[in-house]
């Protein structure tokens, strides 16, 4: 297939590699091959948003942020129910906040997948979001909501005829979408390996990111206005920055140097010793240069308080090479005595944040996290995740 024609219309909702075990498609490749000035993704989660925005900015493309929700009649009831997969697209920053809140809420009702019900979804249907439905039985829930559209994608002729009928009956516009599970036809084999037999979607209709012409050929009964509408909706989307968490500012009456000096006395370390003095000076200068002081204050405070209530691991990973960590009671290993390198922990040439691994008893871990929430606020504490990839090292 000609690369130039793959993205011949603005796609509002493309699935990417971040629809884990459901779809395949590397973000960088999808964006690189996009020929329009806008592009939307809608995965089962928001994991790819930050990378998506960065890649779009590099390629001068307007990013459109969406999320695909599994919607049922009663999310609290943990039973298998008819599921409608609906896409919510943010028109502005408030729309992003709506999606974040709904995404978090849906995790509370996880049953094979994160789910929400129609009533909860309606609470967030305002002028800040666009809602697409690829199914039609529950359209009555959204009558009167002006940003609600029926989504037409390559499926059976009977299904497409029904979409047309519902559109005319309820006066709901149709928007053409590419219901993809991988980018190109030749990617089908990789998709099947990545998602596995259990999650594989098998159908005879188009599963790759289709061109406008492929969609028209597959959906002859869908009006031309459905293709123009995707471009019109893209124009309604504002350009905005994703919200960023505010770094915690630690309230301290002393400096890191003063804390290290006080701790050195307790640990019987002579800071007049040139080896220790030079190492401490070098570490503190780099920590200050990279603006990591608050991070060390927070971790030290957390570990010292935890040690009063539980066993805390002595050190693990590269942080054991830091004299500052040792003097702040974060670790219990003297890096100079054991000839450990600080540069494995923080290096002037590295842009990544320092990573301090701390071991708490399994049964006490949640209490440590709760103390952080109590100290700094619920909105300032979050878990991080790691994305595993099927690739050689």
Predicted region positions:
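Active-site-adjacent beta->alpha loops and helix N-cap segments on the catalytic face
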Residues: 45-55, 157-162
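Conserved active-site carboxylates
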Residues: 1-39, 72-149, 182, 186-302, ...
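Ser/Thr-glycine-rich phosphate-binding loops at phosphate-binding pockets of nucleotides
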Residues: 16, 38-45, 316-320
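Active-site metal-binding loops of divalent metal-dependent hydrolases
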Residues: 14, 44, 67-69, 180
């Amino acid at each position: 297939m000609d690369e130039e024609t793959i993205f011949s219309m603005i796609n509002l909702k493309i699935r990417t590699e971040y629809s884990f075990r459901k779809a395949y498609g590397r973000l960088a490749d999808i964006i690189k091959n996009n020929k329009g000035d806008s592009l939307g993704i809608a995965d089962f989660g928001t994991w790819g948003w930050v990378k998506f925005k960065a890649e779009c900015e590099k390629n001068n493309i307007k990013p459109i942020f969406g999320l695909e929700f599994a919607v049922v009649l009663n999310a609290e009831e943990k039973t298998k129910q008819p599921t409608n997969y609906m896409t919510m697209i943010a028109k502005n920053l408030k729309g992003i906040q709506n999606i974040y809140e709904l995404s978090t809420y849906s995790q509370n009702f996880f049953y094979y997948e994160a789910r929400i019900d129609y009533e909860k979804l309606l609470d967030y249907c305002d002028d800040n979001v666009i809602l697409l439905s690829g199914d039609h039985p529950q359209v009555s829930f959204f009558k009167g909501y002006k940003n609600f559209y029926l989504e037409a994608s390559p499926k059976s002729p009977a299904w497409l005829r029904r979409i047309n009928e519902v559109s005319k009956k309820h006066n709901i516009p149709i928007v053409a979408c590419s219901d993809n599970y991988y980018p190109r036809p030749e990617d089908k084999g990789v998709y099947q390996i990545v998602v596995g037999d259990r999650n594989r979607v098998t159908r005879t209709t188009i599963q790759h990111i289709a061109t406008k012409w492929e969609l028209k050929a597959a959906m002859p009964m869908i009006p031309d206005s459905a293709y123009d509408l995707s471009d019109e909706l893209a124009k309604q989307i504002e350009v905005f920055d994703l919200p960023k968490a505010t770094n915690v500012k630690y309230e301290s009456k002393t400096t890191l140097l003063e804390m290290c000096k006080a701790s050195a006395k307790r640990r019987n370390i002579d800071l007049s010793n040139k080896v220790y003095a030079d190492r401490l000076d070098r570490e503190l200068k780099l920590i200050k240069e990279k603006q990591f002081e608050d991070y060390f204050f927070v971790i030290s405070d957390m570990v010292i308080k935890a040690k009063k209530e539980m066993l805390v691991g002595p050190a693990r990973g590269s942080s054991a090479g830091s004299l500052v960590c040792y003097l702040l009671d974060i670790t219990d290993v003297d890096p100079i005595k054991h000839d450990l390198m600080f540069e494995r922990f923080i290096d002037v040439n590295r842009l990544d944040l320092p990573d301090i691994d701390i071991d708490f008893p399994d049964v006490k871990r949640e209490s440590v996290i709760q103390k952080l929430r109590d100290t700094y606020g619920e909105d300032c504490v979050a878990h991080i995740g790691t994305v595993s990839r099927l690739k050689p090292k």
